[in-house]
Structure formats: C-alpha cells, structure tokens
Amino acid sequence: MKLEDYKAWLLEHGEIKKEYERPYNPQCDPPEYKDGSYFLSYDLMYAGRPYAGFAVGDVTALACYKYVYDESKAYLKERLKYEV
C-alpha cells in the first residue's frame, strides 16, 4: 500500500480532515464561525502546542488535545512505514 492510498483511506473514513491533513476526533473539531474563523484555543491545540487559555470547557479541550496528539503520533508512526 502506498502512502497516497493510506491517506485516501483515512480521508474516506473521516480520520483526517482535509484542511488539517491530520487525524482528528469529529467531536473535538473546532466550532466554525460564519466568517470561517475558529477559536484561537483550537488553533493552538491543532498546531501541536499545549492548550493555552482558560475558559469554559477546558477539560474537554484538554481531552481533545490529548486525543489529537495521540492519534497524530499513531498516524505519523504508521506513515513512516510508507515513507521512502
């Protein structure tokens, strides 16, 4: 299986969101505003930085960050198998 096929499979099964090209949990996906912007805290989470900011839902955000981090790590590990 080529890397492209693997990525296509992940996209098809909803494990990677096109904009981010990374595994994600649909329940943790950032809320999108009408103008297409996202909460900064989610941007920080998805950029692989620790969640910075304290607001309602911190526990959920941290859980989502951990999920995305763990999934991304697993994805990268899997991806390395297909890298030349």
Go through the PLM ranges and name each one.
Residues 1-24:
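Negatively charged, low-complexity tracts enriched in Asp/Glu with abundant Ser/Thr
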Residues 3, 7-11, 66-69, 73, ...:
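Residue-level detector of alpha-helical secondary structure
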Residues 17-76:
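Acidic, low-complexity, intrinsically disordered interaction modules
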Residues 83-84:
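C-terminal end-of-chain micro-motif
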